[in-house]
Amino acid sequence: MGKVYDWFEERLEIQAIADDITSKYVPPHVNIFYCLGGITLTCFLVQVATGFAMTFYYRPTVTEAFSSVQYIMTEVNFGWLIRSVHRWSASMMVLMMILHIFRVYLTGGFKKPRELTWVTGVILAVLTVSFGVTGYSLPWDQIGYWAVKIVTGVPEAIPIIGSPLVELLRGSVSVGQSTLTRFYSLHTFVLPLLTAIFMLMHFLMIRKQGISGPL
């Protein structure tokens, strides 16, 4: 085992990387409220795991979406628990994100030189809300259907580009299969990928600049 470790250590300097990760200075003013961002990340990871598990059974069609969710809840082993954890962690993620934003704002964590960290955080907040909007529609029940119809109809008030934008969101003039397919694709692929990218940028900047000092 020692020889294997030495082989990797010689090429990758694993010990130096480990020392850098474990020996980062933590300011004395840091308290439990500085953990809100980490809790938000944890909720996101739970979302990814439980969401991935449900993709094995969920069917993104207007005729089968609702019945597939019912199947997950009633027939799949621990399916009810997986979906419930997914919903609970979604609510927790939004709550922790809001509290994290307040903490950063109140402690001045958005000020120079951390402006870009704040910008990526705002983008992550928008992505988090987008998760909620797209995920809410996936069961394709009455609530989900009408929520999608209302949300996708909002841009229609924008002059000139309103109607084309609505059609782009819905995939057609009216809400239907194309809309569900778009929302499913956004919820399970596009948004998670963008979130992972911006989270990585967010954490790398925090790692580089350190935690902001007290007011």
UniProtKB/Swiss-Prot annotation:
Origin species, per record, is: Marchantia polymorpha (Common liverwort)
Which protein family is it in? Belongs to the cytochrome b family. PetB subfamily.
Free-text comment on the cofactor: Binds 2 heme b groups non-covalently with two histidine residues as axial ligands.
Mind telling me which Pfam families this protein's record contains? Cytochrome_B (PF00033)
Membrane topology per the entry is:
Multi-pass membrane protein
Query: What is the official name of this protein in its record?
Result: Cytochrome b6
Q: Which cofactor does it need?
A: heme b; heme c
MF term (GO), any: metal ion binding
Coiled-coil stretches noted in the UniProt entry, renumbered to this chain:
none
The record, for PROSITE patterns, names: CYTB_NTER
Enumerate the residues binding heme c. C35
Function of the molecule: Component of the cytochrome b6-f complex, which mediates electron transfer between photosystem II (PSII) and photosystem I (PSI), cyclic electron flow around PSI, and state transitions.
Q: Which GO terms describe its cellular component?
A: chloroplast thylakoid membrane
Give the binding site residues for heme b 2.
Answer: H86, H187
Q: Which NCBIfam families match?
A: PRK03735.1
Q: Give the domain of life.
A: Eukaryota
Q: What is its main location?
A: plastid
Miscellaneous comment text of the record: Heme 1 (or BH or b566) is high-potential and absorbs at about 566 nm, and heme 2 (or BL or b562) is low-potential and absorbs at about 562 nm.
- The answer, when asked if Transport is one of the entry's keywords, is yes
List UniProt keywords, sorted A-Z. Answer: Chloroplast, Electron transport, Heme, Iron, Membrane, Metal-binding, Photosynthesis, Plastid, Thylakoid, Transmembrane, Transmembrane helix, Transport
Q: Which amino acids does the record list as binding heme b 1?
A: H100, H202
Question: What residue intervals traverse the membrane?
Answer: 32-52, 90-110, 116-136, 186-206
Compartments annotated for it: namely: Plastid, Chloroplast thylakoid membrane
Kindly list the biological process annotations in GO that this record carries. Answer: photosynthesis; respiratory electron transport chain
Self-association and partners: The 4 large subunits of the cytochrome b6-f complex are cytochrome b6, subunit IV (17 kDa polypeptide, PetD), cytochrome f and the Rieske protein, while the 4 small subunits are PetG, PetL, PetM and PetN. The complex functions as a dimer.
